[in-house]
């Protein structure tokens, strides 16, 4: 089976397991009347903080239960300037997040990843999971 290799992969391959657990604390809630300092009982959450730590914090409650995930990661198009290692850096950033998302995803769940046309050919991390669907294009 083909594998994707990049500089730094060995350092991040298990990084998602090393991310510390954080407890999600409800500090306020929202409803049609605005913000409240007390919990209104809603299961919806706005999480402020590092997204890697937030994903790890969701695992105890939602592991294997999420039916639909949509992410819109940075496109890695090089608009910030050409860097010969930018693809490696992007993969090192994305891999642990995708591994945690995979743990959250239900067996019959689906993940949508928003990427641009040039990123499509480069986004092969999702291919490590065998349940692939054809790309969904929106113009």
Set out the residue ranges of the language-model regions:
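DnaQ-like (DEDDh/DEDDy) 3′-5′ exonuclease domain used for proofreading
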Residues: 1-70, 75-96
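Conserved Class I SAM-dependent methyltransferase catalytic core
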Residues: 87-139
């Amino acid at each position: 089976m083909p594998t994707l290799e990049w500089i730094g992969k060995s350092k991040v391959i298990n990084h998602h397991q090393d991310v510390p657990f954080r407890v999600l604390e409800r500090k306020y809630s929202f409803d049609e009347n605005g913000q409240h300092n007390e919990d209104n009982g809603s299961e919806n959450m706005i999480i402020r903080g590092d997204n890697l730590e937030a994903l790890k914090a969701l695992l105890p409650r939602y592991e294997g239960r999420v039916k639909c995930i949509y992410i819109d990661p940075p496109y890695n198009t090089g608009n910030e300037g050409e860097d010969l290692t930018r693809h490696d850096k992007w993969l090192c950033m994305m891999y642990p997040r995708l591994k945690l998302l995979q743990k959250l995803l239900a067996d019959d769940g689906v993940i949508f990843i928003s990427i641009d046309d040039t990123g499509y050919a480069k986004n092969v991390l999702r291919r490590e999971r065998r349940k692939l669907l054809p790309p969904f294009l929106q113009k």
